[in-house]
Amino acid sequence: MMVERLITQPRHIEVQVLADQHGQVACLFERECSLQRRHQKLVEEAASPVMTDAHWQTLRESCTRLIRAAGYTGAGTVEFMYDPHTESFAFLEVNARLQVEHPVTEMITGVDLVQWQIRIAQGEALALAPALMNGDRTAILGHAIECRIVAEDPSKGFMPSIGYLRGWAAPMGPGIRFDTGFGPGREVTRYYDSLIAKLIGYGATRDEAEPLATRP
């Protein structure tokens, strides 16, 4: 029998890391992905509204030790469960890839994670701003929130829905990033995830980012 500690009202916190082949590890702050359905993330934001400087130093040090001990290189995500009652973090896993929600980290750091993943694979050394390399939270540029847009049928319990996109109007404007591979006339097939787009709202504060990410 295996017994695990129960965490009530948990929050899903993950740290974006970049590690090169020369021993350097950059922890590019955290994302919060607590809003989920059926254990699937729906809304992600950076940085987490519950993160403190003390918590961040603990997470950053833990992630750096883990990545170096594993000899990991490239882009990755270290995931934790946060217990708000004990203010403690429980390690979940390392995702050895870029996450769907990586754009919110790009927005608040100005770092192109896709580009750096390739450059690291080519043997380049990380050359980010010192504040980013050191995990200094003064380097965080505003706040970003990502909402996943999915092809699902609300009349059938939000089951994935297939078919052709008859209409498509991508949101535009300052503070908005819209990532997708779909457009009018494209087919949503049964062979892939129901995710068809990501809407990212960015602002100087969380209050500024929220209405951009949730606009109708």
Q: Can you annotate each of these PLM segments?
A:
Residues 1-216:
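ATP-dependent carboxylate activation and anion-phosphoryl transfer catalytic cores
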